[in-house]
Amino acid sequence: FPASPVVWDSVDSISHLFEQAASQSRSFFGKFVTRFELPRTQKAEGNLICSFDQVLVTSTTDKNALLKLTPKDKRPSPISVLPNGVDLDYFQPNSDIQRDEETIVFSGKMSYHANISMVKYLVDEVMPRVWKVRPAARLIIVGKDPTPDIKAFAENPLIAVTGTVADIRPFLWCATVSVVPLLYGAGIQNKILEAMATGTPVVTTSRTLSALEAQPGTEILVADTADAFSAEVLRLLGNKTLVHEI
């Protein structure tokens, strides 16, 4: 019998993630450990993309990042982009729950260094600007395995850290805005897909757009500085018309 074709579902480029984390992460692991692991990861991924009949990734950015790692003496396998999806029967709007105009939500595994960096950026840079205008605004950090420094944010009465939850949807339904200030990353941000599927407006950075088909300004709000990011969050808080439109 002929050999069966072998497909590597890479999902994303880990070395591309590490390359960004080495310079931009706000966590010890993200900055120092990934810097140490980067050369080995680049070499491993470069060899892997030449070792299969087909390679799958979730975004064009990751495809291009992998192709750059191809050894000079080898030919890369075909790489196809297969974006992540979301279960629209599970993640959908819920008109029975009224959104709290002061609630902002962030979701993700809170031991993951990219998520830790995002939350630290939110707490240190974005939320102080939001609180100057809306002092009652609340940030809810939803996700399992929060590190001690993330848990410590809950000492602020305007910040909640949930840890593991059985169902993310109620937190998305009650929030006026989902925030994803991606400083570095790879692949598709599933947290954005889930929020959009529940009808929760998303404010994010331009780094997420290459993996999404959302239109900035009409389907998603985009800002790359703390001033601009907080301004977009404030645009949504208390503006039911805009919340409905995004």
Q: What feature does the model see in each segment?
A:
Residues 4-43:
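Acceptor-binding helix/loop patch of EC 2.4 sugar-transfer enzymes
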Residues 191-194, 201-205:
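Short hydrophobic beta-strand element within catalytic cores of glycosyltransferases
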Residues 50, 68, 81-174:
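Conserved catalytic-core segment of nucleotide-activated headgroup transferases in glycan assembly
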Residues 42-76:
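A short, active-site helix/loop in glycosyltransferases that binds the activated sugar's phosphate group
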Residues 220-227, 235-240:
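Conserved acidic donor-binding segment of nucleotide-sugar-dependent glycosyltransferases
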Residues 53, 170-187, 198-201:
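Acidic donor-binding loop of glycosyltransferase active sites
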